[in-house]
Structures are given as structure tokens and as C-alpha cells.
């Protein structure tokens, strides 16, 4: 049978509310918006975080802190790191990346590492990846501490998990505070094809617990 194909943007559909499209443009990374709403064929290579999107500045005083943890239990030199990211969210929605740290340690040392970061930052919530053996870390911290722990079960791939933050980087809504380690930007600017992405994953988990308050609504 003969067939024909059309390539048309969502904006050409009279049944789609223009306001809905505008909101999607604000909440999605540009590559996703161009693919899904503008019907463009976009090459995803190198389309994640761009250096020109990075902003630097100080975090306002008095904002609550949130910690995200991407777990890896190993001391082997080739193993992944346990990554920790500390963020705050300003009244205007700006995300402040306040601290980044990582360790390559065994179970007991990882527990101490998380406790140390919590003691330093006094977080309102700690989001910890909770899958398979990593669930034991969450259970042990809940048993032996009074820390505000929330186990997070990854239900999406890492690029999709990071997409809300990617959109905010592109819209100049993420601020890097002073003193962050150089490896953080190395990971960020090579994500998702770099050798390591542990602290980027931790940042995505920090965003999940920071951005989950219903009072903030959808962003």
C-alpha cells in the first residue's frame, strides 16, 4: 500500500493549548523540547551541560540544605565512588550547589562519610540511592542515627533523572558556590559519556529531595 509521512510540530496542532507548549519549553531541556514539541531531528551528541551555562556565586544565608548520595561500596581503584552533593533552593527557585564530595570506601567508612557530611551541613533531608545491597546503608543509618533519610529507588535512567536539572542549568537557574572540587565540573561537562558520573547522580538525588515540596508546585 502507498503511504505518506508528515513531520509537523506540536504548535501546528489546533487542539493543543499554546500555553501548554510554552510551559513544556520552560521545564524541558531544549533538546527534548525541540524533539518532542517542534518535531526537529536533533543529534544528542554533546547536547547535555555546556560550559557557558555554568554560573558562580554565593548562597544566601539561612536556606535549608539537602543532600543527595549516590552509593558505591568498594575500595578498588577502578571502582565507582560514593558521591555526595549538597544543595539549597532559593526563594526565586535558584538551585545552589554548595558542596560536592566523594569517597571510595567500604561499608563502614561510607556510613561515617555520610554522617560526616550530615554533621557539617545539618540537612533537612538526605536522599540516598536504595537498590539491592545499597538498601543496607539506608537501613543502617536509620537504625543508628536520627538523620532525615529518604531512600530513593531509581525508576528512570540517569539522563532522564538529571533532565530537570539540565533544564535549570540551561535557564541559568543553577549556581555553583565557591570551593567546589574540579572533578565536579569535569564530570558535569562530560555527562553522560564520561568515565565517572557519581557526583552528577548525587546531584540528581539532591534535586529530588530538594524539589519535592508540594508547596513549590511544578517547575
Where are these regions (language model features)?
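Hydrophobic residues at beta-strand termini and immediately following loops
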Residues: 6-8, 37, 100, 152
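ATPase catalytic-site recognition across NTP-hydrolyzing enzymes
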Residues: 13-71
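Acidic two-metal-ion nuclease catalytic site recognized across multiple nuclease folds
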Residues: 46, 206-219
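An active-site-proximal beta-strand-loop segment
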Residues: 69-82
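Mg2+-dependent endonuclease catalytic cores in nucleic-acid-processing enzymes, primarily RNase H-like
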Residues: 83-194
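Charged alpha-helix within mobile-element recombinases
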Residues: 187-210
Amino acid at each position: 500500500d502507498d503511504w505518506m509521512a508528515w513531520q509537523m510540530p506540536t504548535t501546528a496542532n489546533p487542539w493543543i493549548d499554546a500555553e501548554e507548549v510554552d510551559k513544556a519549553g520552560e521545564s524541558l531541556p531544549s533538546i527534548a523540547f525541540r524533539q518532542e514539541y517542534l518535531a526537529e531531528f536533533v543529534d544528542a551528541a554533546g547536547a547535555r551541560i555546556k560550559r557557558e551555562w555554568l554560573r558562580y556565586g554565593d548562597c544566601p544565608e539561612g536556606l535549608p540544605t539537602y543532600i543527595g548520595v549516590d552509593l558505591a561500596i568498594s575500595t578498588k581503584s577502578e571502582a565507582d565512588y560514593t558521591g555526595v552533593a549538597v544543595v539549597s533552593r532559593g526563594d526565586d527557585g535558584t538551585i545552589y550547589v554548595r558542596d560536592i564530595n566523594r569517597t571510595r570506601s567500604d561499608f563502614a567508612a561510607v556510613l561515617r562519610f555520610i554522617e560526616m557530611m550530615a554533621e557539617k551541613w545539618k540537612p533537612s533531608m538526605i536522599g540516598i540511592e536504595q537498590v539491592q545491597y545499597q538498601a543496607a546503608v539506608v537501613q543502617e543509618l536509620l537504625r543508628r542515627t536520627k538523620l532525615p533519610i529518604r531512600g530513593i529507588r531509581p525508576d528512570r535512567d540517569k539522563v532522564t533523572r538529571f533532565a530537570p536539572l539540565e533544564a535549570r542549568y540551561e535557564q541559568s537557574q543553577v549556581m555553583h558556590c565557591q570551593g567546589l572540587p574540579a572533578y565536579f565540573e569535569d564530570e558535569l561537562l562530560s555527562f553522560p559519556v564520561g568515565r565517572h558520573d557519581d557526583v552528577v547522580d548525587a546531584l540528581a538525588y539532591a534535586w529530588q529531595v530538594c524539589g519535592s515540596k508540594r508547596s513549590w508546585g511544578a517547575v
